[in-house]
Amino acid sequence: MTTNYIFVTGGVVSSLGKGIAAASLAAILEARGLNVTIMKLDPYINVDPGTMSPIQHGEVFVTEDGAETDLDLGHYERFIRTKMTRRNNFTTGRIYSDVLRKERRGDYLGATVQVIPHITNAIKERVLAGGEGHDVVLVEIGGTVGDIESLPFLEAIRQMAVEIGREHTLFMHLTLVPYMAAAGEVKTKPTQHSVKELLSIGIQPDILICRSDRAVPANERAKIALFCNVPEKAVISLKDVDSIYKIPGLLKSQGLDDYICKRFSLTCPEANLAEWEQVIYEEANPAGEVTIGMVGKYIELPDAYKSVIEALKHGGLKNRVTVNIKLIDSQDVETRGVEILKDLDAILIPGGFGYRGVEGKIATARYARENNIPYLGICLGMQVALIEFARNVAGMENANSTEFVPDCKYPVVALITEWRDEDGNVEVRSEKSDLGGTMRLGAQQCQLDDESLVRQLYGEPTITERHRHRYEVNNMLLKPIEAAGLRVAGRSGDDQLVEIIEVPNHPWFVACQFHPEFTSTPRDGHPLFAGFVKAASEYQKRQAK
């Protein structure tokens, strides 16, 4: 089986939406029956985004096999059925780390280690390994053409096109076509210069995706085709849309998938986008709306909670309601009080790290519990709910997590010091361990209590969800908390760790240690988010009476 590669680059400016465009194209190709995957190559020197600030980089998306990756992999999984793995994302830092390790080991037999061929070869090896077993692999190169950091990646994909053959490789370039209001027309010059930059590296794009706030007229696309040496039918207009889930249909309507299949000599049926049309219909025809407050510490950059925001929207689709998300800084709860939480139909506290704003989250959990407002806590959101319950119901005054107060009297949340990794090896950690790559990561089994709400929502006794955390419920202090009325609704497969808690005498109060947002998709949704949004709708109706 021959694997075909589509290399996706971006020019003129960053944040054009390469990830969404690549994922949308992959969705169309998948709908044609092709086995598709997507890779993201990030030019930064961090080994992975695990220790990067969410305010700078956005969320860290965790794959099933426990890799901490770029948020674009979340888009990929929401658009196609293929599950991403650690093979689907790597950085300059990872490549250099691998090459330097080999050099120290003597693998290069005394050769002078250079960017070409050693770094470029390492990049090519990883791309080829990630593409094994697939009909089509889309490879997104992070950053913008012209960035010094991207050069080794661009050189590597240039070489791959020569080595694999142009009949099995395509270069797809996203570029900005700005509209100039004063002139009353779109301008193609930035695109021409961007392609010129690519040509100087030795890459002739085969497809141009023209990003604009409006449809690019046919005459302007013809002009771009002429000056950039690309067939007219391969110049695609990609205008701004009110829903990213419309993009597969937009690309298909311009024949992009037909062009690619013809170039790769692939014989496959027409794409059936009925599932995406259903998503668009549900999104455009809600029967109501709810307002959900998300209380966190990184709210100045919504991308820090990208998967949570998308999962809430998916929950809305499953209930035919529009979900309005109100982002609330947990420090504002500390300074202004819980008054700012009024007029919400439900409250969600997502994951996070560090002490800043934690007391505001604890106050938020208490407000939701005492006022019967639907509550969903994720990761840290579960831990603050547990701390709040321990303090205010179980009588454990000043209960806390050792992450925030190491010597507190009631450490109801504590560091996980030992667990097994995906290979079955025992991992041991302490407070002095490195921050990078030292968490409980990836898919883990969870056994659900038969009497629990989550058992009803999931409809099965055992589930698998993804984790990213260092701290867990302290089993030594669990009994008095359970005696006070808290239900442990889910435990790890080995019965050692608390994964889900509920407040039984509350209409809907669920908190989980894992990250359900990572497995929610627009077509399938997720049981927790669907149930949470439904609870928000029911709360709204009760309040209206």
Curated annotation (Swiss-Prot):
The EC category is: ligase
Please give the residue ranges the record annotates as the region Amidoligase domain.
1-266
What terms describe the molecular function in GO for this protein? ATP binding; CTP synthase activity; glutaminase activity; identical protein binding; metal ion binding
Q: Which positions does UniProt annotate for UTP binding?
A: S14, K187, T188, K189, P190, T191, Q192, K223
Active-site residues, Swiss-Prot/TrEMBL: C379 (nucleophile), H515, E517
Q: Name one GO cellular component term.
A: cytosol
Q: Which GO terms describe its biological process?
A: 'de novo' CTP biosynthetic process; pyrimidine nucleobase biosynthetic process
Q: What highest taxon heads this organism's lineage?
A: Bacteria
State the pathway, as annotated in the record. Answer: Pyrimidine metabolism; CTP biosynthesis via de novo pathway; CTP from UDP: step 2/2
Q: Which residues bind ATP?
A: S15, L16, G17, K18, G19, I20, D72, K239, D240, V241
Binding positions for Mg(2+)? D72, E140
Binding residues annotated for CTP, in chain numbering: S14, D147, I148, E149, K187, T188, K189, P190, T191, Q192, K223
Q: What is its EC number?
A: 6.3.4.2
Question: Which reaction(s) are listed as its catalytic activity?
Answer: UTP + L-glutamine + ATP + H2O = CTP + L-glutamate + ADP + phosphate + 2 H(+); L-glutamine + H2O = L-glutamate + NH4(+); UTP + NH4(+) + ATP = CTP + ADP + phosphate + 2 H(+)
Which family is this protein grouped under? Belongs to the CTP synthase family.
Give the multimer and partner information.
Homotetramer.
Task: Say what the protein does.
Answer: Catalyzes the ATP-dependent amination of UTP to CTP with either L-glutamine or ammonia as the source of nitrogen. Regulates intracellular CTP levels through interactions with the four ribonucleotide triphosphates.
Please share what else the UniProt entry notes about this protein.
CTPSs have evolved a hybrid strategy for distinguishing between UTP and CTP. The overlapping regions of the product feedback inhibitory and substrate sites recognize a common feature in both compounds, the triphosphate moiety. To differentiate isosteric substrate and product pyrimidine rings, an additional pocket far from the expected kinase/ligase catalytic site, specifically recognizes the cytosine and ribose portions of the product inhibitor.
> Mind telling me what this protein is named?
CTP synthase
